Design a protein with these regions (language model features):
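Acidic, metal-coordinating catalytic segment for phosphate/diphosphate chemistry
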Residues: 1-17, 88
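Conserved Nudix-box catalytic region and its N-terminal flanking loop in Nudix hydrolases
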Residues: 25-63, 67
Length: 143
């Protein structure tokens, strides 16, 4: 079995996350795999070696949701550090967060997304969102 380099890493794991907007709603995915299985967040994932951040953002949204996007701008970043009971760094992520408009495609769950959903502001409080997703959504639509 291959070791997951994101578990007890020797350096932070770089990723992207994308707030995709369409008609006043944002696209969220319910994670299908640990460590966030069942939790809602923006689509996103890892940046490959030699891959530009914006290219990784477009690829991850396409893989997880089937939606093609036009990136508007970088809007935030998130630093996630999880320590185990002994204080060792179990996971360390640095996510660059983009805002984008949906330009084509029908939302469908793919890759590690268990479900996708277009969500209006009135629904945010009812969903089990990651802390950073909730914080970014609380700032409102950045477009």
């Amino acid at each position: 079995m291959t070791r997951d380099p994101r578990h007890y890493p020797d350096r932070p794991y770089l990723g992207v996350s994308v707030a995709v907007w369409r008609d006043g709603e944002v696209l969220l995915v319910r994670r299908g795999r640990a460590p966030l299985a069942g939790v809602w967040s923006f689509p996103g994932g890892g940046v490959g070696l030699g891959e530009r951040l914006a290219d990784a953002a477009r690829r991850e949204v396409r893989e997880e949701t089937g939606i093609e996007i036009a990136i508007v701008r970088q809007i935030d970043h998130a630093e996630i550090i999880v320590r185990d009971a002994d204080g060792l760094v179990e996971r360390h992520y640095v996510l660059i967060v983009f805002a984008a408009n949906a330009i084509s495609g029908e939302a469908r769950a793919g890759d590690d997304a268990a479900e996708t959903r277009w969500v209006g502001a009135q629904e945010f409080a009812r969903l089990n969102l990651t802390e950073d997703t909730r914080r970014i959504l609380a700032a409102g639509n950045p477009l």
